[in-house]
């Protein structure tokens, strides 16, 4: 695997989750461009830098020990990658503090390095939170590969931070630099809310939640076919998002015990808010995690899952396949994984490689609901 070279450090970096013979790199030209641009400014050692949305730690790990750096983002996998890459390169795994995106930073910051996220609502929320947290003369520098850099990103920086200057392209990457200027303090439009009729719920959705403005069509196809009569079963909602699957299931199964996990901190916060609103003080475990990687083996009777098919800008079924493997490990013999997926993804054949029985519970023209029994 090639080293990541920058003016601050040469690093051996890995992605998360790790895959054997992974052809994808844990960095790109936008990471290098951001660090080269920062180095050209010759920042003092006490320069306070906030790094946002660092995919696998390339930015923060490079700056560790060179500047005063804090990292923040919405991905638990990104946090794991930062810690592993710091340790992998001879630095303390905790040498760069990490703050989940749903927590408040403590400025003032002299420089903010931003990897532009796929969800612009997350960028908007982060820019609003930066107001009042920037030192005089501070800059917010956002980087992305040009094919993933929407015009709206610069518009948001202009709106909330100050005048924006776009760089020349370099290795198909571009930077947007906003210099702090007088801007009215903004109120965040997040979280957003929407209502369901069946079950009757109002759901809170923080900025980076998938399908934040309404129920996604896969979940809509899944909800009428959630398992019933579960008794005191131990149930996990794997990749829970705003928690709607687990909450709907819990309302129909009052004695079952639930665990909700997601790698997005904002999804976890949304799920906590929604569980509290719908089910009050009913016991539940909700936390950010690498799926069910930390779940005790053979400790669940049921797993519910609407698996993702992309990680940031990378599309594929590798995350779904890993979640299916995790579910199999966590289920008792005779336990069942229930999933919804696009027909064209061929999940039936993939599940058949892991489980002794796979059946179609329901289907629409676009989606299938499957039950896989261990």
UniProtKB/Swiss-Prot annotation:
Keywords: Cytoplasm, Methyltransferase, rRNA processing, S-adenosyl-L-methionine, Transferase
An example molecular function term from Gene Ontology annotations: 23S rRNA (guanine(1835)-N(2))-methyltransferase activity
EC number: 2.1.1.174
SUPFAM superfamilies recorded: S-adenosyl-L-methionine-dependent methyltransferases
InterPro entries: DNA_methylase_N6_adenine_CS, rRNA_m2G-MeTrfase_RlmG, RsmC/RlmG, SAM-dependent_MTases_sf, Small_mtfrase_dom
Signal peptide residues on this chain, from the entry's feature table: none
A single Gene Ontology CC term: cytoplasm
Localization, UniProt: Cytoplasm
Catalytic activity annotation: guanosine(1835) in 23S rRNA + S-adenosyl-L-methionine = N(2)-methylguanosine(1835) in 23S rRNA + S-adenosyl-L-homocysteine + H(+)
Matches recorded under Pfam families: MTS (PF05175)
Family membership noted in the UniProt record: Belongs to the methyltransferase superfamily. RlmG family.
Known function: Specifically methylates the guanine in position 1835 (m2G1835) of 23S rRNA.
Name listed for the protein in its UniProt record: Ribosomal RNA large subunit methyltransferase G
Record organism: Pseudomonas entomophila (strain L48)
Gene: rlmG
């Amino acid at each position: 695997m090639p080293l990541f070279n920058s003016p601050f450090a040469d690093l051996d970096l890995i992605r998360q989750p790790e895959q054997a013979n992974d052809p994808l790199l844990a960095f790109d030209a936008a990471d290098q461009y951001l660090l080269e641009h920062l180095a050209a400014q010759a920042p003092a050692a006490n320069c306070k830098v906030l790094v946002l949305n660092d995919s696998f730690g390339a930015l923060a790990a490079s700056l560790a020990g060179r500047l005063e750096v804090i990292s923040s983002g919405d991905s638990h996998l990104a946090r794991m990658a930062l810690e592993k890459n710091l340790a992998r390169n001879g630095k303390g795994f905790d040498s760069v503090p990490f703050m989940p995106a749903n927590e408040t930073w403590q400025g003032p910051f002299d420089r903010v390095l931003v990897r532009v996220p796929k969800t612009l609502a997350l960028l908007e929320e982060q820019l609003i939170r930066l107001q009042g947290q920037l030192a005089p003369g501070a800059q917010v520098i956002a980087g992305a590969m040009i094919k993933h850099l929407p015009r709206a990103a610069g518009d948001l920086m202009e709106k909330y931070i100050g005048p924006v200057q776009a760089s020349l392209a370099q290795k198909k990457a571009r930077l947007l630099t906003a210099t702090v200027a007088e801007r009215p303090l903004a109120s965040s439009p997040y979280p957003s809310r929407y209502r369901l009729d069946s079950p009757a719920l109002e759901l809170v959705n923080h900025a980076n939640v998938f399908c934040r403005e309404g129920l996604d069509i896969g979940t809509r196809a899944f909800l009428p076919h959630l398992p019933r009569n579960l008794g005191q079963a131990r149930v996990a909602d794997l990749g829970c998002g705003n928690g709607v699957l687990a909450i709907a299931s819990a309302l129909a199964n009052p004695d079952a015990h639930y665990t909700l996990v997601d790698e997005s901190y904002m999804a976890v916060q949304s799920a906590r808010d929604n569980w509290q609103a719908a089910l009050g003080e009913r016991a539940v475990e909700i936390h950010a995690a690498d799926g069910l990687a930390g779940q005790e083996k053979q400790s669940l009777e049921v797993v519910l899952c609407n698996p993702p098919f992309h990680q940031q800008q990378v599309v594929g079924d590798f995350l779904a396949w890993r979640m299916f493997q995790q579910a199999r490990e966590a289920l008792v013999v005779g336990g069942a994984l229930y999933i919804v997926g696009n027909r064209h993804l061929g999940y039936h054949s993939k599940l058949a490689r892991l489980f002794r029985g796979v059946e179609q519970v329901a289907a629409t023209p676009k989606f299938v609901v499957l039950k896989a029994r261990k």
